[in-house]
Amino acid sequence: MNIGSLNSVIEALRENLQFNKLFISTSRRDHRIDKVIKLCREKNVVFQMVPEEAITRKAGEDHQGVYAELSPIRFYSIEEIVSNRKKGLILILDSITDTGNLGAIIRSAVAADVDGIIISLRNSAPINETVLKTSAGTLVKAKIVQSGNLSQDIKYLKENDFWVVGTVMERDKSIPYYKFDFTVNTAIVMGNEFKGVSPLLQKNSDQLVYIPHSEAIDSLNVSAAAAVLLFEALRQKG
């Protein structure tokens, strides 16, 4: 993965990710550039000071005076997530296609201290620099599972004492999210930006919930909706 965001580089350094290359502009100086240099020296990460135009050639115009090439992000297995759980809170993302939404959801999930994020491999946004940037660098702290079959993963979670909560817009077959008892082991399913949670995953959910909102809008953005549910779960869990 290649990144040109200062916050992303700083988080990657803090999390001891493997840097293949790191270039820093000789013409930029601010406290975050100084922080990058300090962290590199503390963690023995090799970096090169280069002219600004050298970074622009690699990263394009949209960079912040740094450019890094990272080794691939580590992904986890669902078994690792379940066996090492602390909060008993997992987020399942069913075909989230927008990288901005994915990054924002990951940021909220890390802030809510989830044990892991399960992302469908098919019809989902790629894990790339945009996701890293919109997550404000928190992608490197997230424990992500790439799933080839969300239905099988949900079955596994149920077998390991998780309640699966699907989010929907329809109120006739669901309850308000705040009436669900999130103190139990919970896996929250968020659906595609346009289609929502698939009918199969709705059927496989133990409970469907909705978020009450003004009639002035049809629905919340999926990243906003995820934040609402995650922080209600965090509040209840204490």
Which residues does each predicted region cover?
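Short, acidic/turn-prone active-site loops that include or flank metal/cofactor-
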Residues: S27-R28, E52-E53, R122-S124, E193-K195, ...
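Glycine- and other small-residue-rich loops at beta-strand/loop junctions that grip anionic moieties
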Residues: M1, S25, D94-S95, S120, ...
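Short acidic-hydrophobic, aromatic-tinged amphipathic segments that line or gate anion-handling sites
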Residues: F47-P51, K143-S151, V209
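Active-site/ligand-binding-proximal alpha/beta "capping" segment
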Residues: V165-N221
